[in-house]
């Protein structure tokens, strides 16, 4: 009897039982797949087994074979936006993903101002949070995936997370900037939007890059760039633990809000920003993925009059000129002198969305991009500044770049000019909206050679922006 039992057991073990396909967390029910694309599917199955993937939007079955270790990958063509659909995978036993939508997918990343949830941080609320949470159920086509905080010495290929549908119960803990960005896309395009957020408060840009990418960045202080000692500042740790687990997921583009933790090496931030964008596009396998980022918002830091913040902001704008398919959302009017996490996250998310809508979806009539300094010429005791994208409508309309100053006239504020001595003095500015120019002058500077705008950590400006953008020089 004992021998008979052993023979039967051996025969049972010899039978190849069907195994269920295993997927990474980012491929799951409730997800949004990028429309009109060949999206990546990958995972594990029985070694050398045939893996079949069938999507209900067209009923077609796509096949591939797992390698000797059980790993497999294939491309799944999507069509126009729509859903909900099912995706069925099998190497013998079916695995069904349901409530799948097809639409637009964006990756949202950065440090705490991107991480800040709709419900806010303790004693640091998000303006309009209650309304945003209450009406979240009106946007069932918004789906959210939050990569957990993981700092890893080695590359990871998965994470512990799941897609969620926008509801009052789920939205409160999701990135506020990310959610408001996605909500505006959803409202403007009328199609599903998938948002993947990967954020860590206090993180440096180097933590989101590979060591090789940092080493290949020319002209920087490599020792400082690699001097991080914390989980969120050591080079490559967050790239390994929070980017690689989702980097194969097909997406449209990126939004980014980071830089506060790089004030110590502001002089290298432009080059590092350019290198990060190049790296991420290579990692996703698409060198033209749009990359939109947020100007750091005003905050006192070491003091109102000090300048660690505007030096980083200047680096952000200089990077813009070297990053194709990019844009920046200005926040000069959205800061807070005593809270590093300002409350007006809706405006930040929407300004980023306006950039995407204008540049990637062909939506016209939006206030994007922000005015950007183009050139300067001298006219006697005045400096005449030329901008791209200055508003061209009436000075006192809702799209005005200016407000009434103390003298009762509409004037831009925050400008300073200097002569050869480089001592800056407050300047009077006149808005020449009809030809995209601003004239600045000061009674204390007869021969001006330099101009700057809002060049301090925090400045209460007398002018207002359009509701959606601010100018930078």
Q: Predicted segment positions?
A:
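Sec-dependent signal peptide recognition
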Residues: 2-10
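Extended acidic/polar, glycine-enriched regions
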Residues: 42, 46-117, 121-124
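Single conserved hydrophobic/aromatic residue that forms the stacking wall/gate
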Residues: 462-473
């Amino acid at each position: 009897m004992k021998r008979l039992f052993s023979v039967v057991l051996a025969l049972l073990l010899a039978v190849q039982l069907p195994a269920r396909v295993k997927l990474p967390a980012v491929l799951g029910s409730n997800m949004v797949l990028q429309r009109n694309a060949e999206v990546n599917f990958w995972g594990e199955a029985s070694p050398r087994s045939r893996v079949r993937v069938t999507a209900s939007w067209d009923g077609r079955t796509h096949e591939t074979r797992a390698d000797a270790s059980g790993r497999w990958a294939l491309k799944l063509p999507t069509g126009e936006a729509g859903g909900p659909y099912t995706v069925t995978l099998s190497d013998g036993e079916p695995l069904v993903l349901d409530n799948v939508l097809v639409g637009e997918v964006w990756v949202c990343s950065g440090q705490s101002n991107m991480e800040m949830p709709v419900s806010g941080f303790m004693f640091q609320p998000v303006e309009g949070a209650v309304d945003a949470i209450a009406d979240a159920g009106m946007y069932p086509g918004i789906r959210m995936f939050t990569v957990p905080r993981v700092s890893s010495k080695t590359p990871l290929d998965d994470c512990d997370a799941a897609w969620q549908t926008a509801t009052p119960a789920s939205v409160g803990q999701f990135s506020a900037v990310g959610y408001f960005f996605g909500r505006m896309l959803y409202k403007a395009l009328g199609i599903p939007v998938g948002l993947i957020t990967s954020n860590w408060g206090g993180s440096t840009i180097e933590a989101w890059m590979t060591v090789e990418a940092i080493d290949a960045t020319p002209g920087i202080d490599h020792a400082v760039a690699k001097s991080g000692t914390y989980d969120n500042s050591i080079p490559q740790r967050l790239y390994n633990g929070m980017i690689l687990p989702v980097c194969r997921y097909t997406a449209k583009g990126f939004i980014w809000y980071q830089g506060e933790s790089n004030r110590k090496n502001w002089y290298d931030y432009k080059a590092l920003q350019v290198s990060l964008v190049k790296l991420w596009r290579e990692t996703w396998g698409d060198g033209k993925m749009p990359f939109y980022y947020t100007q750091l918002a005003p905050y006192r830091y070491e003091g109102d009059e000090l300048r660690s913040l505007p030096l980083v902001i200047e680096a952000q704008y200089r990077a813009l000129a070297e990053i194709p398919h990019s844009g920046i959302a200005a926040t000069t009017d959205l800061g807070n002198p005593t809270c590093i996490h300002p409350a007006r996250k809706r405006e930040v998310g929407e300004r980023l969305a306006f950039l995407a809508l204008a540049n990637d979806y062909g939506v016209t009539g939006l206030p994007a991009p922000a005015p950007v300094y183009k050139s300067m010429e001298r006219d006697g005791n005045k400096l005449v500044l030329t901008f791209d994208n200055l508003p061209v409508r009436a000075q006192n309309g809702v799209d005005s770049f200016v407000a009434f100053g103390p003298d009762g006239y509409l004037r831009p504020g925050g400008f300073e000019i200097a002569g050869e001595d480089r001592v800056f003095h407050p300047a009077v500015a006149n808005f020449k909206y009809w030809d995209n120019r601003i004239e600045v002058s000061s009674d204390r500077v007869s021969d001006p050679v330099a101009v700057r705008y809002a060049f301090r950590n925090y400045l209460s400006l007398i002018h207002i922006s359009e509701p959606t953008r601010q100018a930078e020089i």
